Amino acid sequence: MLNEQDYKLLAAKGITEQQLNQQLADLRAGFPFLELSAAASLDNGGIYAPTPEVRKAYLRAWQDYVADVDHKVVKFVPASGAASRMFKDLFTFLDGTSETPDTDFMKSFFEHLPQAAFLHDLDQKLQELHGKTSEQLVAEGDYKSVVAALLGTRGLNYGHLPKALLKFHRYEGDTSRTPFEEHLVEGALYAKNAEGKVQLHFTVSPEHRSLFETLSATASQQLGAQYQAQYDISFSEQKSSTDTIAANADGTPFRNADGSLLFRPGGHGALIENLNDIDADIIFVKTVDNVSPDRLKEDTVTNKQLLAGLLVSLQAQAFAYLEELEEGNVSEERMQEILHFLEKDLHCQSDTAHGLEGLELLDYLYTRLNRPIRVCGMVRNVGEPGGGPFMVYNADGSISLQILESSQIDMNDPAKKRLFEEGTHFNPVDLVCGVRDFNGEKFHLPDFVDPSTGFISHKSKDGKELLALELPGLWNGAMSDWNTVFVEVPLSTFNPVKTVNDLFRPQHQV
């Protein structure tokens, strides 16, 4: 089935033949739906809403934690995502026959264009290209030249850049910030240590890395002075060893016109490898486009500190218990206390655990506690697309908290569909991760991935249909075997930009 060229390609990518065969088997068999127990909610205890007093305690816990310079905190931002989908309607207008805006979306775009953070740059470019501003061109009815200058390679090239590098927010004095810069500001506000050091890591695509590095050099100096921060910014790219094989409808490998195997990027789940490479104690994870201007940052900062304070508090308790368990001389009464912590605070529920005693119970407690831990913010469901928080049955019959996408749930089962639709909260991708064990050693994060939680989608290449394989999502199956806690955070912390017109919402205006 494989030829000499195939083996060379596999070797170059760092993919074994065994991995290739497993991917093809997954594409043929598909992935099972997950077995739901319930949608996590405030009512059933799956989502936690701390009282004001408890919130204060967690905020203090985080301040104490970052005050210790031996603690290494990193803010991790997946930033390779292209902005092209943001401008889908603009591309359609540009390619269409109408010379004037003929949809509500395009009318709204031109109505609000004067508020855009990128207007200054756009007008400069239009002056170069046409000797006129956007206002003048619009007055003349030349809408398409404005859109072409925003999206095209002769203009600002926004249609082909990553979202992280687009100007999102306009500030006084004609200054503006990209999401990249807003994440630097956020980092200074909640991830700065006692020496003023702020560490951020961005995953980027190879073709845009130099643009990130250029912006990083100037932004880290300017914002470092403004926020008394010493930035340490690093970048990585998705590893080619995480690419996945494409398949024909019959499950055989898809080949390009030249006969070579077609591999595709494995989706954001591939970034568990990048996350694993980071040398840190605590890692904040957040999507690149969920940023707010300064006037709205307070909620975000406070709630990030809250999540982190809860995490280090839970972790400290888990570590203390693990030290006792490792020594081995633990009474049955003490083990029942630890089991209660595991079930009530870390939401690991298992009927069989209650039938264990002695060494069997000790071993169970040790194994379950000695895992990476994540605390995830969850916002009230307001109909936004995306995954949600659920209580899910594991293969051993135990129940744990998981973030699921709709494709992981059997929507043909009315009961399951109802659970999904009645979910009170959804996942804004707002995580704090503890990635070291109680001995200070880093966990090997790929060991905690559930390989049976990938995704299959239908795509096409050169006019031919293909099956594409996505690895278990970074905050879905890639963190399936972590200890997980869900906490309610306000909707004000969730301001994603999915279309260019989202930038004109009040949440993105200064």
Predicted features along the sequence, with ranges:
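Long, compositionally biased intrinsically disordered regions
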Residues: L2-L42, K192, A217, L356, ...
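Domain-scale recognition of functional cores that engage charged ligands
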Residues: L10, G14, A39-V382, G386, ...
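Conserved catalytic alpha/beta cores of large enzymes that bind or transform nucleotide phosphates
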Residues: H130-G141, Y158, D289, D294, ...
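Intrinsically disordered, low-complexity boundary segments flanking structured domains
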Residues: A219-G224, M391, N412-E421, L469-N476
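C-terminal, active-site-flanking charged/polar segments
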Residues: I283, Y393-P428, D437, T453-H458
